[in-house]
Structures are given as structure tokens and as C-alpha cells.
Amino acid sequence: MEYWFRYGVTEIPIEVSEEISCEKISLYRGFEVDYKILSEIAGEVGRKSGEVTILYDHEHQTQLELLRSLLYEIQSQTSLEGRVKIIFSSWRTSPRIVEEILKSSLKGFSCKIEYVEDCKKTSYTGLKTPVDVLESDTRILVTSILPHGLYRYPSIVNSLIYSKLIEKEEDVDVHSILEDKLQILGLCIVGEKTYLDSLTNLDKSSIIEAEKIYTVNLEPVDILIADAWGWPWDSTLESTLHILRLVYKGVREDGMIGLIAECKEGIGRREFAEKLFKIYEENIQDSYIEIVREVLRNRRVGMVTTLPRTLLENTLHIKSFDTPQEFLKYSLRIYSKNARIRIVNGPILIE
């Protein structure tokens, strides 16, 4: 039986003999734009003459489709020229990659695009926020919710903080400021649906819905092979390691996890790379390194990746492979052909 994994911008296969017990779970989901919701927003923008600021916290491709559809809908009702500015960030993947994606995907729209770290910011009732947010008539957040190994299901407000679209300077009620004073409207994808609401209501309803969609209870198997969702999530080692915590409960103690992640852009941020190379020289504290340590206490981990084998094996004790087939051959030598195997595609949190 042949199975496929997302790997960068492409897919790579694995062949599992029918003699071996193997099951597959996939939570890649389709997405249909809710134009009724987008028309409602566009109508609101059309009734006003001031500027529009869209805060965009990038997480996945369907979210980009939602942003494009929103801009099309606004453009069909009013001119975008000089009115719309997109302030973007992403704490999940490289902002440089997100910038390339946005500029390529939004070429046909007359809107400004700026990375949040390059924005002029100011203090406002205990928060530090881009000046454009304060000066706009309409403020929209385009976001989504997927499971993450560090935070399970991060709230929308916490995601804004992680991505530095807002920064807390004082101990204040962030929800109240964003909703009552700044009146930021939230447009959020969860699974196949789009939700439009206040940030407070979205935080409650969207996390509950995401948990229903992406959290599953599964019996542990001997070998679990999971992709890291493809580009841009698997662009660096740093951005993929959280997957281990999402899936490790689906593997028995002393079992083995295979993570399929291209890591085309290398290790990740310089700060993370420095910690990785000093991992045995001093008491390194890093959330992603701790995930690996936690999983390796009673499980084996291998990676199919372009990263050098010696890098992974000498720092994190993760064995590296060139193909999923090579990983499978190695793991079956350890667990035999009687091993139970699980293939995992897409965002999933195994309990």
C-alpha cells in the first residue's frame, strides 16, 4: 500500500507491505469561502471613507485564500487604492517566508504590506501597537487556529502577542482594549468554516471547535510516521519540532516516531541555532529543545529531512534518513514486521 507525505512544496511516498498492520489518519481539510461574511465586512468598509488596517497572523494556505477573497470582495464594492494596509507576522514560521508568500499572492491588489517589526508603534492604554491600527477607521484581524506542540490551541489574543502584532506594556485587560476601544473585528478559520465575531467571542468558540476537529484519542502503536504539514511549516528544524509533542502519545513507550520535514531553510532563527550548537556545553533552556528531550526519554525519533545527518545525531540524538522508505526499513528491523504502524497527515493532536 502506498502512502504520501507533504514535504516542502511537494509530496514523497512510502510503500508499506500489506502483510504489515498499518492505518492512516489525515486531517488535511478542504475550505470554502463564506462570501456572505466577507460581503458583510466589505459593506462596512464601503460605508466608511477612512483607512482599513488588516492584521494578518499567517498560519496556513487556506488563511491566505481567505485574505485574498476578502480583498476581492472589498475591491468589488469600493476602491482599495491608498486605503488598505496589511500588517503581517507569524510566530509559527519565518516572517521572511511569509513576506515572500504575501507579495507573490497579492500582486493584483492596491494595498500596502508591512512586516510588524518594521511598523512604527506607539503606546495605547497599556499596549504597544502599530500606529496604523490607531489611525484606521476599520480594523480586521485575519487568523486561524491549529494545534501547536507548545501551546495546544493558542488563543487568538495570545497569538497576537506571540507575533508582536500587539505587545503588553502593563497588566491590562487585553480583550477589553482590543474589543471595546480598538474595536478589532476577528475573521477566523477553524477547520472548514469561517467565523466573524468579536475577539472575545472568537476566542471562546473557535478554540472549542478546533479541539473537536483536531484532537483525537488513539491507541498507541509501535511506529508512527507523520509529516510536518509541508511548506512553509516544515521550512526549518525549529518550526517542525513542536509536531513531536502533538503526536508522541500515539506511540507506545520505546516506540519510534518518524518526522517528515524538508527543512529547506535550515535550522531556524540564529538564537535557536546558537542554543542547538551549545546544547552540551551549558544548561540550555529552549522550549523546542525541551520537546525533543521530553519525547526521547522513552521513545525513539527519526527524521526524513535535508539537514545533515551529523547535525541531528550529534545535537538532538535524532537519527536522520533520506526517504520515508529508508526510515521504515530501519524501524522494522527494530520492531519486526509484526509492528503496528500509523501514518499521520496534517494537523492533529493525539491524546
Please describe what each predicted stretch is.
Residues 76-79, 83-88, 240-241, 245-351:
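C-terminal non-catalytic interaction/assembly regions of soluble proteins
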Residues 1-37:
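N-terminal amphipathic/basic leader segments beginning at the initiator methionine
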Residues 108-220, 225-229:
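Conserved, well-structured core segments that form the ligand-binding/active-site neighborhood
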Residues 98-121, 280-282, 287-298:
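A glycine-rich helix N-cap at a beta->alpha junction
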Residues 30-37, 112-118, 318-327:
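Short acidic-hydrophobic, aromatic-tinged amphipathic segments that line or gate anion-handling sites
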Residues 33-37, 202-218, 235-242, 283-285:
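A general structural motif
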Residues 22-48, 72, 205-215:
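Short N-terminal or domain-adjacent regulatory/targeting segments
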Residues 37-104, 225, 238-274:
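N-terminal active-site beta-alpha-beta segment that forms phosphate/nucleotide-binding
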